Amino acid sequence: MINKIYGKIVDKKESSIIILAFPFEFEILVSSFCKMELRLLEDVEILTYFHFRDDDVKLFGFLNISEREVFENLIGVDGIGPKAALKILSGIKYDAFRLAIAKEDINLISKVKGIGNKIAGKIFLKLRGKLVKGDESSSYMLKFKELEQSIVNMGFDRKLVVVAFREIMLSDKFLILKEAEQEQFLFTETLKRLSV
């Protein structure tokens, strides 16, 4: 199995990236969120999943272990192969997916293009409890703990800030943002909600 590839991104295609790991070039299928985080000619470390069948050999790439873990759990669901799993992770970011499973939010999963209520229900039944480590929503929000404290220091009630964070983080607008843009969006939207 190929666990990880270090190299330079030399091309970005619709659903893949090309990495030069001298002397080889690898085409790696990635989610749209993963692709948005990567820049051409950037040196990267991509975690991989090597898919091998008699008639199909593909390499799938991920920014971190959590994204790969969600992918591997998804392909364990009957009827969901690697391409479908990647399509799901292109429609909903891996950490939001984990949060949706933890919060039993089947509607968020079923909003992904090509995933209806039936498949979303199947995913939920198979993965319920598998992706949750403690309070998933709390671990998801740890990234924004300093931002939360900053807003509380402005005189807002912590409970209201946390509620606003959770609602905003599950919104479509938040989920399509690059990680670097999420904090600013969360700050602005939280202040809008709390200032009403």
From Swiss-Prot:
Region (Domain I): 1-63
Source organism per UniProt: Borrelia recurrentis (strain A1)
Stretches for region Domain II: 64-142
Source superkingdom: Bacteria
Cellular localization per UniProt: Cytoplasm
Function: The RuvA-RuvB-RuvC complex processes Holliday junction (HJ) DNA during genetic recombination and DNA repair, while the RuvA-RuvB complex plays an important role in the rescue of blocked DNA replication forks via replication fork reversal (RFR). RuvA specifically binds to HJ cruciform DNA, conferring on it an open structure. The RuvB hexamer acts as an ATP-dependent pump, pulling dsDNA into and through the RuvAB complex. HJ branch migration allows RuvC to scan DNA until it finds its consensus sequence, where it cleaves and resolves the cruciform DNA.
Entry keyword set: Cytoplasm, DNA damage, DNA recombination, DNA repair, DNA-binding
Domain notes: Has three domains with a flexible linker between the domains II and III and assumes an 'L' shape. Domain III is highly mobile and contacts RuvB.
Chain residue ranges for the region called Domain III: 143-196
Pfam short name (any one): HHH_5
Main location: cytoplasm
Family from the record: Belongs to the RuvA family.
Summary of subunit composition and partner proteins: Homotetramer. Forms an RuvA(8)-RuvB(12)-Holliday junction (HJ) complex. HJ DNA is sandwiched between 2 RuvA tetramers; dsDNA enters through RuvA and exits via RuvB. An RuvB hexamer assembles on each DNA strand where it exits the tetramer. Each RuvB hexamer is contacted by two RuvA subunits (via domain III) on 2 adjacent RuvB subunits; this complex drives branch migration. In the full resolvosome a probable DNA-RuvA(4)-RuvB(12)-RuvC(2) complex forms which resolves the HJ.
Chain intervals for the UniProt region annotation (Flexible linker): 143
InterPro entries noted in UniProt: DNA_helicase_Holl-junc_RuvA_I (IPR013849), Hlx-hairpin-Hlx_DNA-bd_motif (IPR003583), NA-bd_OB-fold (IPR012340), RuvA (IPR000085), RuvA_2-like (IPR010994)
Protein's UniProt keywords contain Cytoplasm: yes
Entry GO terms, CC: cytoplasm; Holliday junction resolvase complex
Annotated protein name in UniProt: Holliday junction branch migration complex subunit RuvA
Annotated TM spans: none
